[in-house]
């Protein structure tokens, strides 16, 4: 079947479809040169002839042409470039006729024999690894079927070899892989024998890139055409020469490594190797020059060379690490590596320039086939002599001799040669630094060595500063990283790189912190060898200065990195370096040639170095830190001291500042500071005294005062004018508190005096269980009894049966005394549920159990309330006393535990939860069984609740449960009208403080009729008590109450109340004299009393709605309020309590006016008119 090739776009490779054999329609460069080189037209006859020649049948299918298109389309990376380089030519459509492939003649050509011989030698060479290099198969035999050797997918055979492609692989590829495995095994064996050597250094990258570039150029230069065709014969010879040169260099490197291992004096042997390598380079120099000329010639040869260079750059990305085995041998013996010759070091320096620049360019190359033209534009600037030349970096593997000749040429030339050599060095070192910075995988030892080399020359500050001032940087070096971080392998023992301070600072941010630090021993070594470095850098080597041999230096821009030879041994003193080098040169046969080569290569660098050293004397030295700080110190306000160690120039420059210095110009002297401290201390004391006076002038005892003696002393110490001032502007606060003061009702030390949760036992109550649950509870302990109760056993047991009284009483006591509030709430829930279930049994003749007055009194008494506080009134006492409560409880709960624990308090704080639970249960009992308590008992319970509400700790707790119980108790009183005056008089006696009495009035609920009545009557009783009026019977009618209220309101004038209090106080005083402070206190009490009385007046008048008949009484009350109370109050900013009383007056007056407006006027009057008082 005939295969047709689709035309491909220019600049893009044509790859075969997956799963198909590679196309055989690669057009020959010779026949399509016009189409690829430019837009030239070709005749149809030439095109047809080229197609026919291309598809001629081959002589033998088993043998392939060397590097023929049949093995093309090897893809590298993501750019999909092929080895053959023919993808840049446009592909033409093949003839529709079936053509036969031209066979290769069966006899072997001399080129193939030469390459086969190289492969055999390559197999014998165990020192170099070829594993990373793509193999070109040249054998006539194939591997056995089923051999698992990896071959990249891009190595496609021709269509005729499709049957053999699935079963065979190249024997040379297999051989190279075996060589790679043997070399790795040898390296592992050497690593075991040299286990004592811990320091591993990497092979110089110059050797790596040199070998890889040579091998690439040799392979890329091989012809892709038939050997019988004349246009490509010269290129076959050139590729063969390159291959032979590569084999020769491999042999030389192998000999050099063996000599380094076996011989201690490697200096002479290394020089011999360098001479041999230079002779080999001169041997192949004409062919390289002929190849360079082909780059300039336009046409077919130029285009093919460009393609070959392009492919050589493509291969360098995969073959850059090829000769690592050679480096591994050198790393095995780091002690002998220290004795390397200067020739090999300089050679590796030159070799590491352009290959690394090419590698950096390849690493930055964008992916994609359309970027292939950009590789040709990458050039290297070389200036041997005065001629500038652009050269493609792809041909760098053959330029080793050019580098050496370019380095030797300036030795016989003038200053222009030095300038051009420095420029080329700048360009190459720039590429090298950029490449090194882009490789983070470099070994740590190599980075440390480069950093040490840069740090050894950091002390030459004057030389580097002069170089930075007069150097002209090229545009190519504008983006180059610092030299401190460019790890150029210069073997650290013979050459060093002076690096500027700015570059070192810039490189420190890019290098790791661990690599940039130096040890203390290394710093000591730098201090010792500083003199040696300066002597060698000035040109004192081999017995004399180098600058004198080559004439005076010219002022040209110095190189960015100057390669300066230094002392071979870092431990040797500086004065012995020239003699040692002379003795080493005399003992070797090739020392003179080595010196000439050293002088020729670094002639330009030495001249620029000489120029820097000569100009160093004229440069002004940098000022030290002390001098700079002295200048800044002198520019500040003048001081008495002088900065130490001032130079003459600095003293002359700063004479203007020091001339005006005079002592005693400090703004903050010692005397001034002491005076300021004394003033500050005096002001602080005065501020404290004023604050104390302000506190004393307010009339409130200061918390700082301890006794009256201290206060009198403080008052005596004040001036009269100060006393008047404080008295005039003192502000009295909290004269009328918002909350009642309350009383201490509960004594927690007496809590648990009768029983507690540990002494209460249901088995001691005389209860006999009948059901299974009752028996279970009786058999259980005290803790288990509480547990069964809270888990609902009692609720289920007495759901349909009456609960015995001992169980209910035990639950009531346990609820009041249990310290856990959650358990107390659960017991309350159980007790209320059982009580409600017992009330539903209507057929039962027995009322449900409710706690008696003695049970309630015993519970509150056990909480810590004194018996007298429970029943404070002498005329209203219960039928039992305190001893009865204690004896009754002891009879029900007997045992040693009760006697032992009776003296231990069970509560440390107010048991508000237990109190509220008892009140809640009492509220349930009074609502279920209203007739459970007698009127007397109800009155005692009401008085008990009122007394308990005066507890100080209950002021912030809403007593809603108390009010609910009070409503039930007032409702259950049978003879209400008879009991109201008695109840009011009893509540009036519960406290003597007016504000506490007002609290008791406000506790009475006003949302019931009995509650409002009790409030009105109680308010009138308390008003009469506070006004020292004789007790009279309180009228029940509301009209009479309002009329009585008008009489009381006239006596509520604050001034009248104050007079009464003053008279009463004078009667108590023996001398009958009242001072101003006491008078102020009495005034506060008078207004406080007025405030309480006005609240009680409001409770009387605003408790319920009034009829139209009471309208005239409210009109009289409003007039009396304004005339006697409001007009008597004189407001003052210092006396806030007056304003508070007047505000209450305004509110009461507003309420009364609302009542007046709501009441209808009397019959026959449309409007009310003011009638003056008679």
Curated annotation (Swiss-Prot):
Pfam families (alphabetical): CANIN
Principal subcellular localisation of the protein: nucleus
Q: Does the keyword DNA repair apply?
A: yes
Q: Where is this region: Interaction with SIMC1?
A: 636-1174
An example of a Gene Ontology cellular component annotation for this protein is: site of double-strand break
The ranges of region (Required for interaction with SLF1 and RAD18) come to 703-1174
Among InterPro entries, the record links this protein to: CANIN_dom, FAM178
NSE6-like domain: where is this region? 665-1167
List where Basic and acidic residues composition bias occurs.
39-50, 162-175, 181-199, 279-294, 340-350, 356-374, 500-521
The keyword Nucleus appears for this protein: yes
Q: Which UniProt keywords apply?
A: DNA damage, DNA repair, Nucleus, Phosphoprotein
Question: Residues where Phosphoserine occurs?
Answer: 482, 604, 608, 615
Output compositional bias ranges, type Acidic residues: 603-620
GO BP annotations listed: DNA damage response; DNA repair; positive regulation of double-strand break repair; positive regulation of maintenance of mitotic sister chromatid cohesion; positive regulation of protein-containing complex assembly; protein localization to site of double-strand break
Q: Where is the composition biased (Basic residues)?
A: 94-103
Cited function: Plays a role in the DNA damage response (DDR) pathway by regulating postreplication repair of UV-damaged DNA and genomic stability maintenance. The SLF1-SLF2 complex acts to link RAD18 with the SMC5-SMC6 complex at replication-coupled interstrand cross-links (ICL) and DNA double-strand breaks (DSBs) sites on chromatin during DNA repair in response to stalled replication forks. Promotes the recruitment of the SMC5-SMC6 complex to DNA lesions. May play a role in SMC5-SMC6 complex recruitment for viral restriction.
- Give the family per the record: Belongs to the FAM178 family.
Q: How does it assemble?
A: Forms a heterodimer with SIMC1. Interacts with SLF1 (via N-terminus); this interaction links RAD18 to the SMC5-SMC6 complex. Interacts with RAD18; this interaction is increased in a SLF1-dependent manner. Interacts with SMC5 and SMC6.
Protein name according to UniProt: SMC5-SMC6 complex localization factor protein 2
What is the native source organism of this protein?
Pongo abelii (Sumatran orangutan)
Taxonomic placement: Eukaryota, Metazoa, Chordata, Craniata, Vertebrata
